Amino acid sequence: MEIRVVPFDHPDAVKLIDLVQQEYVTRYGDPDVTPVDPAQFSPPHGIFLVGYRDGVPVACGGWRAHDGPVPTFRPGDAELKRMFVVDTERGNGFARAMLAQLERTALAAGRRRAVLETGTEQPEAIALYRSSGYTDIPGFGVYKDEPESVYLAKELKES
């Protein structure tokens, strides 16, 4: 998989974001309504990545900077958003590759911790994050009081 930096509103990113929102509807009954400003995913305060296999967009993910004062966030945090791999490409290691690239770019931009929210209806995502060193943190954002929300973080370090 070739991973490229693209704008959040790039046609390939929009296509994949639409698919991830459909996935949320299937799993949770509604799309993610967390406010997202595309400008937050532009360097140096964020990034959005699309993964391509043979020129076809198959995966995406991004991060946006958080420096407080929102509870749970710390100065230097990067919030991961819209991690997704299309159904037909799952099991090929693309999610792990995308996660690693998001962590590398966040660290290179001076971010010290990656934080994210996922849900109990995405056990494969939870397994990926936990196996990559993510641990539980207090909830934040729109879904912080939802029992099916899972909040995780990982300290970013040079490897």
Residue ranges and their predicted role:
Residues 1-81, 86-88, 99-101, 105, ...:
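Acetyl-CoA-dependent GNAT
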Residues 8, 115-118, 126, 130-151:
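Conserved catalytic-core motifs of GNAT/GCN5-like acyltransferases
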Residues 55, 93, 110:
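Conserved G/P- and acidic residue-centered "switch" motifs that form tight phosphate/ATP-binding loops
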Residues 91, 104-108, 135:
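Conserved amphipathic alpha-helical interaction elements at protein-protein interfaces in regulatory
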